[in-house]
Amino acid sequence: INDEFIGLAEKNGQKVQSVVDVAANTASNIQAYIEDAYKIQDQNGYTGETEKSALYDIQLQRINKQVEDFILYNAWSSVSSGSAITGMGVFFEPNAFDPAKTDYTIYVSESDAAKKSCQSYGSYSEYSTQSYYTEAKNTKNTVFTDPYEDQGVTMVTASWPILYNNTVKGVIVVDINVEQFSILDSNDESFKSLYVDV
């Protein structure tokens, strides 16, 4: 009996862990890319070259446009991967991304990923007071919110701080639909009253 429970628990744990791994790997890739961009800017300064933002009606410094594209491609891939990830974004501290935009946010929902589009998540005064932002910023660590309901769906938000020279430059957020975990295996004919809860 114990082996059956262990096997079921391991199988379900792997399902949940795979979602967390996709989120963490994507956040780590974005963190590293942004950190490299900061290093390049510190070493080379501003080149004077600009490109139009995919989201805002502004010209971004070329390196920041490359960061924006990297964020988008990774978010589109992660959100449309068929996992429980329903949204992903990057929210910066004021003036921490590009001088052309004080409050720079970029977010990809499931519908955005399907259309290869994105959206703003509002101004700094709106997102900087949210627990997913403040806790990651203040602790300089990965945080997970308590479950909450958004448009009738139970969610958690995982947040990773963007650090450069030990200064928080922003936060990467990943929204996870915990209702997707209801597909966890809890069927065993030997144990008809068995259920799984995450």
What do these predicted regions represent?
Residues 1-65:
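Juxtamembrane extracytoplasmic/periplasmic/luminal helical "stalk" adjacent to the first N-terminal
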Residues 17, 125-130, 159, 175:
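Amphipathic alpha-helical bundle/coiled-coil segments
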Residues 64-74:
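Well-ordered, non-membrane alpha-helical segments in soluble/globular domains
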Residues 62, 78-141, 146-152:
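Extracellular/periplasmic ligand-sensing ectodomains of membrane signal-transduction proteins
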Residues 89, 195-197:
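Conserved beta-strand cores of small sensory beta-sandwich domains that regulate signal transduction
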Residues 17, 35, 72-83, 186-191:
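Short regulatory alpha-helical segment in sensory/regulatory domains of signaling proteins that mediates
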Residues 153-187:
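Conserved beta-strands of PAS-like sensory domains
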